[in-house]
C-alpha cells in the first residue's frame, strides 16, 4: 500500500512540474492595464499646420551611437541645418513624418511601470550612455512649432509579436512612464540623409521631353589638373526622336581622335540604360563650394575671373571656357550632358574621389557637379519668307513668321528661367555619389579602351 501511495505521489509531482514548465513557455496574453486613454487620441489638439521643425533620434547598432537629425522649415522650404541647410525636398518623406503622429488612437495601455520600458523597447535614445540593454532604445520623433514649443513627441518601440501586419507598436511619450499600443509605421523615422532628399537632381517630370543624352568618357590626371590632357575612351549619344531612339557611338583611336563606329547590341543596351539612370541620381551627402565659385555659377557672366573656380581643382574640376552664357569645365571622371526639348542643357561633371569615409563605409565615392544652360539651336529660328511686294502690305506668310519669331523668343525666355532656377539649386553644392552611381551614369563599354 505504501509503495502504491509513493508511486501515485511521485506521478502527481512529475505532472505538476510538467504543467509548470508548460505554463512558463506557453504564449499567454500579456496583461492589459485598464485606462481612460484607450480609444482616445494620443495627442489631443495636435495640428500639423503648426509644425516647423522635426527632430529624429535613433540608435545605430553598427556604429554603436545615437544618430540625430533636425529638419527645419525655412520660408516655403524644409532644410537640413546639419548639411549646410540643404533643402529636404523628398515630399513623400516629409508628408509621412509630419502626419505620422496625427490621429494616433490608443489601442491598449500595456504598462505604467518604468521597469517595463526595457521589455517594450521604449527607452529614450537620450539615455544611450546609461542604458543596460541598448537594443531596448526606441526611435524618437519630436515635432515643434515656430517658437520651438513641442507639439508632439513619441518614442516608438518594438512591434507586437501577434500582429501579422507588424503595424502595432509599443510607444511612450517621453517623460511619462505609461506604455501604450498604437498603429504606427516607424520606418520613416530615420536620420538617414538620403531619405530626406530627392534623387531627381535634374528636376525632370513626366512633361519633360528629352532631346538627347551625351556621355563623354575620359579621364584627367588630378595631380596635373592644370595641364593634363583628356585620356578619351568614347563619346556616346542617345537621341530621342518622335518615333524612335537612335544611338551614336564614337570611340577613341590611339591618337585620341574620336571615330564613329556602329555600336553592337550590348553597347546599345548599356548606353540606353545609362541614359535612363539620369532620372534618379542618389547621393549620400553634399559639400558646399566656395562662395565666389557658387556666385559665379549662380549668375554666370564673362566678367567673372577664372580664378573664382581655383578651389574646385582639388575636387577634380577645371574651368575651360565661357560659352553660350555658361561656364564650361573638364572633370576628372568625364561628363554627361542632358538636353531637353525646351532648350535647357544640364551637364553632370564627375570629379575626383572623395577621400572622406562616410557612414563607416569603405566604398568609393566621387564628387559630382551640375551646371545648367540653354542651347538655342534646340529651338531653331523660323525660316523668313521671301519679301512681299511693297503694295501688298503684310502678307499672311509674314504674319505667320512673326508669330513664330515671338513664340521662339517666349520659349527661350522660359528655358533661360528654368536654367537659372536649376543653377540656383546646383551652384552651392558638390554632390557625393557612389562608384556604383558613376558606373551607371558613365558606364564602361566593352572594346572602347578605359
Residue ranges and their predicted role:
Residues 2-450:
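Secondary-structure "cap/kink" motif recognition
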Amino acid at each position: 500500500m505504501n509503495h502504491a501511495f509513493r508511486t501515485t505521489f511521485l506521478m502527481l509531482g512529475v505532472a505538476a512540474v510538467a504543467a509548470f514548465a508548460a505554463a512558463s513557455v506557453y504564449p499567454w496574453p500579456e496583461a492589459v492595464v485598464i485606462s481612460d486613454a484607450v480609444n482616445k487620441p494620443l495627442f489631443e489638439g495636435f495640428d500639423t499646420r503648426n509644425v516647423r521643425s522635426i527632430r529624429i533620434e535613433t540608435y545605430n547598432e553598427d556604429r554603436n551611437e545615437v544618430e540625430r537629425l533636425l529638419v527645419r522649415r525655412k520660408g516655403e522650404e524644409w532644410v537640413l541645418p546639419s548639411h549646410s541647410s540643404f533643402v529636404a525636398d523628398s515630399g513623400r518623406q516629409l508628408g509621412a513624418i509630419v502626419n505620422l503622429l496625427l490621429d494616433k488612437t490608443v489601442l491598449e495601455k500595456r504598462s505604467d511601470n518604468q521597469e517595463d520600458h526595457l521589455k517594450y523597447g521604449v527607452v529614450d535614445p537620450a539615455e544611450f550612455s546609461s542604458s543596460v540593454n541598448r537594443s531596448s532604445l526606441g526611435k524618437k520623433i519630436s515635432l515643434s512649432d515656430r517658437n520651438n514649443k513641442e507639439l508632439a513627441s513619441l518614442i516608438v518601440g518594438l512591434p507586437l509579436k501577434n500582429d501579422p501586419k507588424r503595424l502595432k507598436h509599443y510607444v511612450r511619450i517621453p517623460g511619462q512612464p505609461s506604455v501604450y499600443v498604437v498603429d504606427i509605421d516607424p520606418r520613416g523615422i530615420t536620420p538617414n540623409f538620403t531619405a530626406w532628399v530627392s534623387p531627381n537632381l535634374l528636376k525632370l517630370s513626366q512633361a519633360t521631353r528629352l532631346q538627347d543624352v551625351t556621355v563623354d568618357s575620359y579621364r584627367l590626371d588630378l595631380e596635373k589638373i592644370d595641364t593634363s590632357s583628356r585620356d578619351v575612351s568614347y563619346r556616346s549619344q542617345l537621341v530621342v526622336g518622335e518615333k524612335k531612339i537612335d544611338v551614336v557611338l564614337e570611340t577613341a583611336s590611339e591618337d585620341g581622335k574620336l571615330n564613329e563606329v556602329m555600336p553592337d547590341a550590348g553597347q546599345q543596351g548599356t548606353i540606353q540604360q545609362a541614359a535612363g539612370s539620369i532620372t534618379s541620381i542618389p547621393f549620400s551627402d553634399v559639400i558646399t563650394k566656395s562662395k565666389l565659385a557658387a556666385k559665379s555659377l549662380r549668375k554666370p557672366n564673362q566678367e567673372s575671373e577664372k580664378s573664382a573656380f581655383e578651389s574646385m581643382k582639388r575636387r577634380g574640376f577645371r574651368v575651360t571656357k565661357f560659352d553660350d552664357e555658361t561656364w564650361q569645365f573638364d572633370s576628372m571622371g568625364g561628363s554627361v550632358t542632358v538636353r531637353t526639348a525646351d532648350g535647357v542643357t544640364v551637364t553632370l561633371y564627375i570629379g575626383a574621389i572623395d577621400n572622406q569615409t562616410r557612414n563607416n563605409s569603405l566604398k568609393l565615392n566621387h564628387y559630382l557637379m551640375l551646371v545648367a544652360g540653354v542651347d538655342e539651336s534646340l529651338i531653331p529660328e523660323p525660316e523668313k519668307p521671301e519679301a512681299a511686294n511693297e503694295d501688298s502690305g503684310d502678307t499672311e506668310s509674314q504674319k505667320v513668321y512673326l508669330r513664330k519669331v515671338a513664340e521662339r523668343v517666349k520659349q527661350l525666355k522660359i528655358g533661360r528661367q528654368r536654367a537659372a532656377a536649376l543653377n540656383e539649386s546646383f551652384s552651392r553644392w558638390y554632390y557625393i555619389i557612389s562608384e556604383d552611381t558613376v558606373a551607371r551614369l558613365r558606364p564602361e563599354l566593352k572594346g572602347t579602351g578605359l
